[in-house]
Amino acid sequence: NYGVTHTIRHVLVNDNEKDLLLSCYKFDCRSCGNTKLKRVISLGYQPLANNLLNKKDEKCELYPLEVNYCDRCHNCQLSVAVNPKKMFSNYLYTSSTSKSFREHFVNAANKYIKDFKLNKKKSYIIDIGSNDGVALKPFKNLGFKKILGVEPAKNLAKLANKNKIKTFNGFLEKSNLSKIKKDADLILASNVFAHSDKLKEMAECMFKLLSKNGTLIIEVQYLLNTLKDLSFDNIYHE
């Protein structure tokens, strides 16, 4: 009975919606496993982000867009975890189209090179969820040779490789670890954890790819800023 766990007390669903919900609803915290999550906001049923249809009356799958809060570890998370293959097999958003993104990663690359004393010839840099290579391109332009993107979307990995930014096409998961070169001096993960249902596995994989003295940099949304800015439009299935 989906109505029991929904912000709206009773929601009637058909058999297809029922099967969809049962396959992707999350009853435990992705971070700590706590099963007593609190619903803080419901934005109704929504399609996947960037789900562009060819016809106005064309049907698409809708998922409840809700945020759950864990009072044990304070992690905020969506109530459902959509099959990642549906979301990332062919991803429509290319990060390089954003001028602010490009500028951010140029500034970030310069800062990381200085702070961590990275060497153009020796330092090995991995970007997880690398999209079209936007975060690695500044390193490439500065002469870094050992860079690697990890990107699940085939179209984006193909685009990055076409632009001479070496990219592995696949998810960061244990089954793919043997296919990715290890001992990275720097691993970047920008807005990646928000897209994954397997936080612990992904974190474990990152540490296995990292060299003994390497650095892992994670960028995620900050709840306090979301509340201050009322940026509820940053909540979506992606």
Predicted regions and their residues:
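Short, glycine-/aromatic-enriched active-site segment of Class I SAM-dependent methyltransferases
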Residues: 51, 218-238
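Conserved class I S-adenosyl-L-methionine
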Residues: 121-131
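Conserved SAM-binding loop of SAM-dependent methyltransferases across substrates and taxa
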Residues: 132-144
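Conserved SAM-binding motif I beta-strand of class I
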Residues: 146-151
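Conserved SAM-binding strand-loop segment of SAM-dependent methyltransferases
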Residues: 164-177
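N-terminal juxtadomain amphipathic helix
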Residues: 14-100
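A conserved beta-strand element that flanks and buttresses the S-adenosyl-L-methionine
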Residues: 188
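A short glycine-rich, Lys/Arg-flanked "PGG" loop and its adjoining helix->strand segment in the class I
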Residues: 200-215
